[in-house]
C-alpha cells in the first residue's frame, strides 16, 4: 500500500524499494511498502552496535572517554576505514562511536565490539570470542524489541562468509524508536562532522569525520544512518522534527505536542532523494491527520512495539 498516494514526483520511492514512514510519538505508520520483508541492511547494522555499547556504558557506569585498543580482527574486515585505524591503535569509545556512526567506520565498530564484548565476558567469568559475545548481545536486543525478522551476524554489516545481517523496515523502526529515546545516541547521529583522534605508538593522529548521511542538517533532519552494499542496495534511515505545538490551557497549564517522523528506505538506487520525498509526503499526511483531529488509527497502521 502507498497510503493513498500516487508514487511519482517529489522523490517518492521507486518499485522494489522497502520503506516505512512513522510518527514516532503515536507509532502511526503514515506510509509503507514491503516494510515487513527481510532483507540485507549493510551498515544500518551499526545502529544496533551503537545501542548495545551505550546500554552497556550506562549499565556499567563506564565513561565514553575510556580508551580501547583496536583489535587484530579490525585489520581483516575491509570496507570503510576513514581514519586509518590499525590494530594496536588506542582510541576513546566516544571517538570510535563517532567514526562508526557518522563515517560508517568498520574498524571503529569492531573496536567497540571487542572492548565491550571482552568486558561482558570478564564480568560473567566466561571465556570466548569477545566480538561473538557482542553480536549475541545485538541479537538479544533485537529479540527484546520484537524484531522477529532480524538476525545480526557481525557488528559492521559487511558481507562475509556468514552473510551480512538482515532485518526489515518494520524491525528497524522498532530499533530506532528505542535508540531515539537515548540522548547519547542522538548526539552521535545528529552531527554533520566531528574531530576525532587516536594514539599510534605515542603519536596523536587527528581527523575530521564527516557524516555519510548528507541530509543531516536540512529539513529538520538530525539522524540516523546510511548503509549500502551490493545485496542491500542503498539504504538510509532519517529522522526529523518540527517545533513543538504549545497550547495554553489556562490556569498556568500548557499542552505541549512534539512532532517527529522516522523514514526508513531499504534497497534503493536513490536513497537520499527517496527519503527526502517520503519525508515531505509524510509531513503532509501527518498534518492532514492532525488537522482532522488525530482520529483513531486502524490497528494495522500502528507499529507494534515491545
Language model: regions and residue ranges:
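Penicillin-recognizing serine hydrolase domain
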Residues: 3-18, 117-306
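Active-site-adjacent loops and short helices of periplasmic peptidoglycan-processing enzymes
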Residues: 1-170
Amino acid at each position: 500500500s502507498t497510503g493513498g498516494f500516487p508514487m511519482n514526483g517529489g522523490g517518492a520511492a521507486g518499485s522494489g524499494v522497502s520503506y516505512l514512514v512513522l510518527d514516532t510519538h503515536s507509532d502511526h505508520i503514515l506510509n509503507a511498502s514491503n516494510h515487513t520483508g527481510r532483507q540485507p541492511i549493510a551498515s544500518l547494522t551499526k545502529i544496533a552496535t551503537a545501542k548495545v555499547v551505550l546500554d552497556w556504558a550506562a549499565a556499567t557506569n563506564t565513561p565514553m572517554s575510556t580508551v580501547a585498543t583496536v583489535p587484530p580482527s579490525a585489520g581483516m574486515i575491509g570496507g570503510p576505514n576513514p581514519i586509518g585505524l590499525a590494530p594496536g591503535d588506542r582510541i576513546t569509545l566516544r571517538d570510535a562511536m563517532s567514526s562508526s556512526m557518522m563515517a560508517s567506520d568498520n574498524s571503529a565498530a569492531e573496536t567497540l565490539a571487542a572492548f565491550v564484548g571482552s568486558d561482558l565476558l570478564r564480568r560473567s567469568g566466561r571465556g570466548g570470542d569477545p566480538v561473538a559475545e557482542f553480536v549475541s548481545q545485538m541479537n538479544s536486543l533485537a529479540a527484546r524489541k520484537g524484531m522477529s525478522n532480524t538476525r545480526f551476524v557481525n557488528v559492521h554489516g559487511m558481507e562475509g562468509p556468514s552473510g551480512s545481517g538482515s532485518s526489515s523496515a518494520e524491525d528497524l523502526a522498532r530499533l530506532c524508536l528505542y535508540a531515539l529515546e537515548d540522548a547519547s545516541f542522538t548526539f552521535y547521529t545528529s552531527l554533520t562532522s566531528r574531530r576525532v583522534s587516536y594514539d599510534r605508538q605515542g603519536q596523536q593522529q587527528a581527523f575530521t569525520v564527516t557524516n555519510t548521511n548528507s541530509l543531516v542538517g536540512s529539513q529538520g533532519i538530525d539522524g540516523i544512518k546510511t548503509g549500502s552494499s551490493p545485496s542491500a542496495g542503498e539504504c538510509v534511515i532519517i529522522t526529523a522534527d518540527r517545533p513543538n505545538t504549545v497550547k495554553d490551557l489556562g490556569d498556568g497549564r500548557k499542552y505541549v505536542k512534539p512532532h517527529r517522523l522516522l523514514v526508513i528506505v531499504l534497497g534503493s538506487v536513490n536513497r537520499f532523494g527517496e527519503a527526502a520525498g517520503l519525508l515531505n509526503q509524510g509531513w503532509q499526511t501527518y498534518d492532514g491527520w492532525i488537522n482532522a483531529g488525530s482520529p483513531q488509527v486502524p490497528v494495522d497502521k500502528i507499529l507494534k512495539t515491545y
